[in-house]
Amino acid sequence: MCDAVIPPQKQELIAEADQQIAKVGKLFNRGLISDNERYNQTIAIWQATTDKVSKALADNLPKDNEIYMMADSGARGSMNQIKQLAGMRGLLANTAGHTIEMPIRANYREGLNILEYFVSARGARKGLADTALRTADSGYLTR
């Protein structure tokens, strides 16, 4: 796990996003923006923050790092997986396909808190169930 280098800017970037989210919340509470606008701005802020953390991770990851070399060569993994391992998981979708406003701020190296763990596990379980159902459907259609 020592190969997964957490970017030092991560906490600053998350704190900056929290400040922006608080400003959006104040605008919403004053009635200056609608709930849909608040939702869209919140999602945009967290997507931008996740991208910034990913960029900081890529910039701080040494080129001779084993994890980086595997992803860069295409042998195993991708930068998205490295982002989840050492950056931040980011935004996830609920069962209806809508993006949840609260991102998973932690990564697998730091460890997820209980809420982040259950949200993440639910998404993984749903993905496995969907795959199993699609496999059964395609098998039936080949008859």
What are these regions (language model features)?
Residues M1-R143:
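Append "with occasional cross-activation on large, charged helical scaffolds in nucleic-acid assemblies
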